[in-house]
């Protein structure tokens, strides 16, 4: 049985790798083809082309790449038509993957889309088009099935992969043995994103905020998680940050950094997204920040339908984690919010209560998320 899998960015690559492993555990003789990154390659996938070609974010950021993306779409559709897999699993990256689904579903290929598009958050009218493109959605969040079921789209809540990502299982002692945090230092975990477009916008702002905060709190020590695609840019930017930042590759070792920051009473300055859930699992109080092109931001403002950007806040249905978005994503507001968090133990304790609330709603009844996802895929294959 051939399963064709398409991931478009680092988070999807990790999801795809876990899904591939779970599919192998549940079905003998399964084979894979598709598009993925290094994690999926470790599971035996030979990517049709570099996954990085699809890792774009923001309306204006995508426009200059449209011709290349169209070519990659043609290439992927032709490969699927030739292979005739039992099922196509598209993972997140809906601007590409759902177009691919639309091209191949008329061929009789079953399509499972893993990570529900956030149509419940903005432009809900698009759900009608989605119904024509997929046979099943695998939802990560517990409130998503009701939205898609109302539109007649089969959906399965499989739970969020952060629950099996090991974010809360790090070894603080191991990290501190390699990277001592001195008495009086307050670590700040910095996660500026894994896409080049994100880090290009956030790194200068985060750096300026850390410098401002260090003026009031001289012991502030940045610990920066650097994704593979952006490691060089992160390293270059962090060289000018205060007190000798510690760079940690985005991989299994980052959980040790999370544990060390939590033990040392530190906090996080985090790009809005799944990183916030990782911080919740690890018990690290934090604030989230995000900034996109001003034109993109104005379009999104007109279409957005939810009160929060942070997944922790959406799950808790209140603001657990401070959000500093767009105009508020500037050095001064970020520095002030970070300092307030570091100086107020009660604020940290309140966040941890909210983390437990939010995470309690993420756990599926069917076991680990990747196993639940594999079962849902095999039902259609």
Please provide the spans of the model-predicted regions.
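Nucleotide-activated sugar donor-binding and catalytic core shared by glycosyltransferases
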Residues: 1-381
């Amino acid at each position: 049985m051939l399963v064709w899998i398409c991931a478009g960015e680092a988070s999807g690559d990790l999801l795809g790798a876990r899904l591939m492993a779970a599919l192998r555990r549940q079905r003998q003789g399964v084979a894979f083809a598709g598009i993925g990154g290094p994690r999926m390659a470790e599971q035996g996938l030979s990517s049709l082309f570099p996954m990085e070609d699809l890792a774009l974010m923001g309306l204006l950021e995508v426009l200059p790449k449209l011709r290349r993306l169209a070519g990659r779409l043609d290439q992927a559709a032709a490969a699927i038509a030739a292979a005739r897999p039992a099922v196509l699993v598209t993972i997140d990256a809906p601007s590409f993957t759902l177009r691919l689904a639309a091209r191949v579903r008329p061929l009789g290929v079953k399509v499972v889309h893993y990570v529900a598009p956030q149509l419940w958050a903005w432009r809900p009218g698009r759900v009608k088009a989605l119904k024509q493109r997929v046979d099943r959605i695998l939802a990560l969040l517990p409130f998503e099935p009701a939205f898609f079921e109302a539109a007649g789209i089969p959906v399965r809540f499989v739970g969020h992969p952060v629950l099996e990502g090991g974010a809360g299982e790090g070894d603080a002692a191991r990290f501190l043995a390699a990277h001592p945090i001195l008495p009086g230092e307050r670590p700040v975990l910095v996660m500026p994103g894994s896409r080049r477009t994100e880090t290009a916008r956030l790194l200068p702002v985060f750096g300026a905020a850390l410098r401002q905060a260090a003026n009031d709190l001289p012991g502030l020590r940045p610990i920066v998680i650097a994704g593979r695609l952006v490691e060089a840019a992160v390293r270059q930017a962090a060289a000018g940050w205060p007190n000798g930042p510690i760079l940690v590759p985005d991989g299994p070792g980052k959980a040790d950094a999370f544990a060390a920051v939590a033990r040392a009473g530190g906090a996080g300055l985090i790009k809005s997204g799944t990183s916030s859930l990782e911080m919740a699992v690890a018990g690290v109080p934090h604030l989230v920040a995000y900034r996109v092109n001003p034109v993109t931001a104005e379009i999104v403002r007109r279409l957005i339908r939810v009160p929060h950007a942070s997944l922790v806040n959406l799950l808790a249905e209140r603001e657990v984690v401070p959000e500093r978005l767009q105009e508020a994503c500037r050095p001064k507001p970020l520095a002030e919010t970070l300092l307030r968090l570091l100086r107020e133990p009660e604020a940290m304790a309140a966040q941890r209560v909210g983390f437990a609330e939010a995470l309690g709603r993420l756990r599926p009844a069917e076991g680990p998320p990747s196993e639940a996802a594999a079962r849902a895929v095999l039902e259609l294959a």
